């Protein structure tokens, strides 16, 4: 485990896996992942920032695709971004607060859908020749997925994927945009990736 400044990294199955503090739109990787909505229409938070930074061709490309199911992923060029591609994945909504049995079942399904977001994004990246990819904290904003649970699902999903697909990537990053998310992700990263 290497720790320097605002990132922590390790090696797993021939891949550098890291948690970094920064802005997803500034990452110099083959693919950045966008926490999109089903209509791929842009929005607020990370989705809005990516649409703004990628420029006016991105909305047109998203309209041509039209729709993305929750738990699935689609790809567009990166346009004005440093990344060659943007993978748009739609994370699940989370039933927050006091929930009944139906709410508990919804949240169990939400965890499966969130794991699918990571798996489908990684598969799509490989299919398009990508060797480096950066993920935001999918579903933790407007979709109200608790950050600790979402981060654990993200890291477990990536770990499982790499164990099943050794050396599929050179680097996988989890990009955290504020101090609280970074501290949380750092702790969960150490829990999941410590030898």
Each model region followed by its residue ranges:
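Glycine-/small-residue-enriched capping loops at alpha/beta junctions
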Residues: 1-127
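Phosphate/ribose-phosphate-bearing ligand recognition and processing surfaces
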Residues: 94-195
């Amino acid at each position: 485990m290497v720790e320097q400044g605002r990132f922590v990294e390790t090696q797993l199955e021939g891949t550098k896996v890291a948690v970094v503090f920064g802005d997803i739109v500034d990452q110099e990787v083959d693919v950045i992942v966008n926490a999109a909505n089903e209509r791929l229409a842009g929005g607020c938070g990370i989705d809005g920032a990516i649409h703004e930074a990628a420029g006016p061709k991105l909305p047109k490309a998203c309209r041509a695709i039209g729709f993305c199911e929750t738990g699935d992923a689609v790809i567009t060029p990166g346009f004005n971004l440093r990344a060659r591609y943007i993978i748009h994945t739609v994370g699940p909504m989370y039933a927050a607060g006091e929930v009944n049995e139906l709410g508990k079942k919804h949240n169990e399904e939400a965890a499966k859908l969130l794991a699918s977001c990571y798996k489908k994004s990684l598969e799509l990246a490989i299919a398009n020749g990508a060797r480096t990819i950066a993920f935001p904290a999918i579903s933790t904003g407007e979709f109200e997925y608790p950050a600790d649970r979402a981060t654990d699902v993200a890291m477990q999903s990536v770990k499982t994927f790499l164990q099943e697909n050794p050396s599929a990537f050179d680097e996988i990053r989890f990009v955290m945009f504020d101090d609280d998310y970074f501290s949380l992700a750092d702790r969960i990263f150490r829990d999941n990736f410590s030898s």
